[in-house]
Amino acid sequence: MVLIRVLANLLILQLSYAQKSSELIIGGDECNINEHRFLVALYTFRSRRFHCGGTLINQEWVLSAARCDRKNIRIKLGMHSTNVTNEDVQTRVPKEKFFCLSSKTYTKWNKDIMLIRLKRPVNNSTHIAPVSLPSNPPSLGSVCRVMGWGTISATKETHPDVPHCANINILDYSVCRAAYARLPATSRTLCAGILEGGKDTCHGDSGGPLICNGQVQGIVSWGGHPCGQPRKPGLYTKVFDHLDWIKSIIAGNKDATCPP
């Protein structure tokens, strides 16, 4: 079993180097305007600055991270450039917010998830459409897509006008345990990144999606500081492990409990 895991990690390392390019998610490529119709931006009424991302999973519900909770949250949908407003941009406020734990007591490696019910549903449009929840967990080595308006510099807060995207790999959880000594032996998180560094989510990307094969498999949670260091992958809340809770809440069971 140990040998298989070592071989798998070596294969992923080779794949990571094969995919290396000039793009970084901290400085990466501008997303195609049509590839992120489900991506939303969270900001507060006072700041007007995006502090987190989120994912539209149906016309009335948005998935994000517990760490992204704020008073007076606003949710922007259909946005690409912050300088040029699409005709179908919509803004919503939460009607209800649900957490596995209090947004103040989640841990970095457990239950960093928030489900937001919008006060008014949104309509599908050219730049707005939900993404599917996962039918199965992602496979080790899967190439997945991360995106957001987070900082594009590992050393200073430099936020782009448009969302940036990059491809990263699903890694064995043991890679993240080796990188972060305090991680428990098991957790309901995904370990994902590029082993040699360079591609990573960063400040301002929290709450945004990890998309694998057209499904939202992860929620950006946390990672190394500064972002994008070699062998310091990111941690993503594992959406598949929370499916029953998500579906129960949406169905109207407000007392649904998260997996232990």
From Swiss-Prot:
A Pfam family the protein falls into: Trypsin
Keywords: Disulfide bond, Glycoprotein, Hemostasis impairing toxin, Secreted, Serine protease homolog, Signal, Toxin
Glycosylation sites: N83, N123, N124
Compartments in which it is found: Secreted
Tissue: Expressed by the venom gland.
Signal peptide: 1-18
A GO CC annotation given for this chain: extracellular region
Chief location category: secreted
Positions of disulphide bridges: C31-C165, C52-C68, C100-C258, C144-C212, C176-C191, C202-C227
Family: Belongs to the peptidase S1 family. Snake venom subfamily.
PANTHER family: KALLIKREIN-1 (PTHR24271:SF47), KALLIKREIN-RELATED (PTHR24271)
This protein's name: Snake venom serine protease homolog 2A
Organism of derivation: Craspedocephalus gramineus (Bamboo pit viper)
